[in-house]
Amino acid sequence: PIYHWGDQDLGGFRILERLQRLAEVSGRQVTPWMMDQPANEGRKALSESDIHKINAICERRGWLSCRLTPPAMAREQESMELRQPP
């Protein structure tokens, strides 16, 4: 599998979706890694609009565990401790 670990914000999910589109060309699947973690210690609150857009991406791609519930915070991957995928 191809894992992607990115920021928990709209830009991070747009990058993830773009990578998925590219992977599909070769029949591959991208799996979000550590993008389903609750971000209570984030630096900035996400707007309702951004939460809606992120959730639309997650639903479209089947990444249901990554959907956000308001209020949600943006979080950069650099602020999280890395764990290796299985």
Residue ranges and their predicted role:
Residues 2-86:
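TOPRIM fold recognition
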